[in-house]
């Protein structure tokens, strides 16, 4: 469980410049120093411990918690700690509709599985060099964007988000689906859109790592309390020739889930 020393050493108490703040965060601010808001760590540790228990209990019930963080300070930590606790993650780019249009996202993941099957059974070698090249490029894009959620068969039960301002679309989708949001909230954030907020710095790498680490520990603790086993490795449906042909044709045309202009 996180300690006050952990929070201080990781700089969790440093907020944004006083000119960049959300007035709704006033109750979480201890004071101001050299133009920077200082977050009240007494409140941080209280919210941290409460939220830790919420996440632990969710994991103990077998629930899925999706990790989200695409800013450069969060990319590595999101992936590392999501994998350590066996949870899905998004750390490349949030695609609009990733949760509210989950069926379409699952179709894109299926295309990734088709391409990988073609590589494994050698059928990709029967294509022209250009077709094979386009397929492999498509595979790389799919893995970058959807690799962290490829095994997520259903919508998550909860979302842990780093930087709710940057990830506002993910927050909006979770709110729309009434999916609980867990997140550190910096002095520029809106606490009203987060179900389980933890006041703290969401920019410093060490602070972000601490938040991710604690969430992973809570999940692993909860999982250890879970007695029933879940079959997380269900067999994939067999890939048909029609699916292979369809994916090849699509790879040769425009991407279905992201335009080149977004790159």
From Swiss-Prot:
This is Small ribosomal subunit protein uS2. It comes from the Bacteria. It comes from Campylobacter curvus (strain 525.92). GO terms for biological process: translation. PANTHER family: 30S RIBOSOMAL PROTEIN S2 PROKARYOTIC AND ORGANELLAR, SMALL RIBOSOMAL SUBUNIT PROTEIN US2M. The lineage of its organism: Bacteria, Pseudomonadati, Campylobacterota, Epsilonproteobacteria, Campylobacterales. Belongs to the universal ribosomal protein uS2 family. GO terms for cellular component: cytosolic small ribosomal subunit. Residues 228-240 have a biased composition (Acidic residues). InterPro entries: Ribosomal_uS2, Ribosomal_uS2_bac/mit/plastid, Ribosomal_uS2_CS, Ribosomal_uS2_flav_dom_sf. Residues 223-246 are annotated as: Disordered.
